[in-house]
Curated annotation (Swiss-Prot):
Residues 26-189 are extracellular. Its main location: membrane. Keywords: Adaptive immunity, Cell membrane, Disulfide bond, Glycoprotein, Immunity, Immunoglobulin domain, Lipoprotein, Membrane, Palmitate, Signal, Transmembrane, Transmembrane helix. A lipid is attached at C213 (S-palmitoyl cysteine). Residues 215-242 are cytoplasmic. The chain crosses the membrane at residues 190-214. Residues 26-140 form the Ig-like V-type domain. It comes from Bos taurus (Bovine). Residues 153-166 have a biased composition (Polar residues). This is T-cell surface glycoprotein CD8 alpha chain. Residues 1-25 form the signal peptide. GO terms for cellular component: external side of plasma membrane. GO terms for biological process: cell surface receptor signaling pathway; cytotoxic T cell differentiation; T cell mediated immunity. The gene is CD8A.
């Protein structure tokens, strides 16, 4: 009868869960409030009713994080009996009424699938009360980072202030030393000729652009033939160009 009653009130419990959290926090004391355990460890959770005469029995439930928001009924505890949900192994999960207002749930050997949020609920005067959630989980796995492979090269003691090209070192002479002209080959000449060639190229391009613009803007002279009027009043056809 108790399991049937619990199955009927579970849908209603989901709708009233948020509203009952305030009442539940004032009506229950959970011990511990959270639990971080390990595989194979024994886990004991206690639910204490703070209001005397609130109820004679208590139901334990578990909510597993995931897509399904419905909690899972685990057991119903009273002074007379312990009613486990179908499919649960009594050697793995058990419960008992410790005192008049304390109800205990015990997991003999914690498993991976036992992780979740545990809570208890009671019905008193047609009111459904829920306790706070007790998270029971395994320790979080630390994020593994790949180990850095040690470098085979020995670290340099003196840091370099700036990078200098080896070609520029060939063309540079130290202060007070004689200049060795035999070493000034093409590697040094390119530092001299490259800016000069670039400058000449820019000047030549500017000259070409200036010439093109001048030819386009030059004033056109009309070369149309016209007769020349002589003093006699008639044009001379032999002299028709000016």
């Amino acid at each position: 009868m108790a399991s049937l009653l619990t199955a009927l009130i579970l849908p209603l419990a989901l709708l009233l869960l948020d509203a009952a959290k305030v009442l539940g926090s004032l009506s229950f004391r959970m011990s511990p409030t959270q639990k971080e355990t390990r595989l194979g460890e024994k886990v004991e959770l206690q639910c204490e009713l703070l209001q005397s005469g609130m109820a004679t029995g208590c139901s334990w439930l578990r909510h597993i994080p995931g897509d399904d928001p419905r909690p899972t009924f685990l057991m119903y505890l009273s002074a007379q009996r312990v009613k486990l949900a179908e499919g649960l192994d009594p050697r793995h999960i058990s419960g008992a009424k410790v005192s008049g207002t304390k109800f205990q749930l015990t997991l003999s050997s914690f498993l991976q699938e036992d992780q979740g949020y545990y809570f208890c609920s009671v019905v008193s005067n047609s009111i459904l009360y829920f306790s706070n959630f007790v998270p029971v989980f395994l320790p979080a796995k630390p994020a593994t980072t790949p180990a850095m492979r040690p470098s085979s090269a020995a670290p340099t003691s003196a840091p370099q202030t700036r990078s200098v090209s080896p070609r520029s070192e060939v063309c540079r002479t130290s202060a007070g030393s004689a200049v060795d002209t035999s070493r000034l080959d093409f590697a040094c000449n390119i530092y001299i000729w490259a800016p000069l060639v670039g400058t000449c190229g820019v000047l030549l391009l500017s000259l070409v652009i200036t010439g093109i613009c001048y030819r386009r803007n030059r004033r056109r002279v009309c070369k149309c033939p016209r007769p020349v009027v002589r003093q006699g009043g008639k044009p001379n056809l032999s002299e028709k160009y000016v």
